[in-house]
Amino acid sequence: DSWMEKMGLTTRVGIDIPGEILSLIPSPEWKERVKGEPWFLGNTYHLSIGQGDLALTVVGLHRSLLAIANGGELCELGIAKDPRCTNLKLKKDNIELVKEGMIGACSPGGTGYTFFDFTPQAGCKTGTAETNEDGKTHAWFSVFAPSESPEIMATVLVERSGEGSKVSGPLAREIFDYWFHP
């Protein structure tokens, strides 16, 4: 299994609202079939940093990052149902390494500057996704807190609006301020 499959990015998340679509995870076969072009090493590089033809859904990315935050459980997402979770059997050291990186992103020197002074400590992932529109990017920001035992996680996406830390980060901060400091 690829890591994309293991983290649930190649299947629907099972959310109980209509209209869910699959993320697009490009492959050499997909590129040849859809674009009539061969796969180059540069395509692999772009895929590894979340660029190029990769198109993740908000709920798909949220669910995969939630599995890091909660210690390795990949859960169905839902509005009005209890989630069913599957243990991914990831090495605890690997989960902790990624989680530490996400905590670092929300700490001074990281990219999630809207959470540098937040208590309790949070972990986050910022993103600026290409759109194939001239100079337009989607702003992503995923965050969970408290970092040691998360009770809330949010993923904010603002389409065609700029950088995740600049645009979506402040919106996520408002949600977390309301949750932790009403």
Residue map of PLM features:
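Beta-lactam-recognizing serine transpeptidase/beta-lactamase-like catalytic domain environment
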Residues: 1-161
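Short amphipathic alpha-helical face segments that pack within enzyme cores
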Residues: 57-63, 167-174
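Ordered, soluble secondary-structure elements with a strong preference for glycine-centered loop motifs
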Residues: 162-166
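Short, gly/Ser/Thr-rich active-site loops of penicillin-recognizing serine hydrolases
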Residues: 86, 171-182
